[in-house]
Amino acid sequence: MNSIQLIIDIILILWLLILTVLYLRKKSLNLNIVKNKKIVRAKRYIVFYVIAESKVKGDDLERVVRNSLKDLLGNVWLNIANPKVVTYREDTQEGIISTNRIGYKAVLASLPFAKEINGNKILIVPRRTTGSLKKAKKLIGLK
């Protein structure tokens, strides 16, 4: 009886040892992927225009976009996506929101929830998502 228990214990210890080695190998492979700066820096630029009753300022617009994302998905997704209004043309009511590759869909989903700025009803309409700032600026007529 003791010899059978000893064999079972040895098999379990070997099994746990094998699982630990496989887990540590997988973890070290994932760390190498995260260190790739091209993946970390991947940006997305959302080209949008604003339909509003009166003119809207860029600073107010960024605050409303961040608040709508926070209301929809919470602080965690706000920190992940980190949306910023890079460029905003007040004359044509067009602009560019910068975000990362992970959070751009969350930002797109939260744009309809931005409904009001300083008592002024607004609607933010995304036109296109691009991977380069140069192309985004070209879409709104800059450079």
Swiss-Prot record:
GO cellular component: a single term: ribonuclease P complex
Q: Name one GO biological process term.
A: tRNA 5'-leader removal
Name where it's found: Cytoplasm
Molecular-function GO term, any one = ribonuclease P activity
Q: Known Pfam families for this protein? A: RNase_P_Rpp14 (PF01900)
Q: Which Gene3D superfamilies match?
A: Ribonuclease P, Pop5 subunit
Q: What reaction gets catalysed by this protein?
A: Endonucleolytic cleavage of RNA, removing 5'-extranucleotides from tRNA precursor
Q: What is its EC number?
A: 3.1.26.5
Query: Keywords for this entry?
Result: Cytoplasm, Endonuclease, Hydrolase, Nuclease, tRNA processing
Disulphide bridges:
none
Similarity remark = Belongs to the eukaryotic/archaeal RNase P protein component 2 family.
Q: Subunit notes for this chain?
A: Consists of a catalytic RNA component and at least 4-5 protein subunits.
What is the annotated role of this protein in its UniProt record? Part of ribonuclease P, a protein complex that generates mature tRNA molecules by cleaving their 5'-ends.
The protein, known as? Ribonuclease P protein component 2
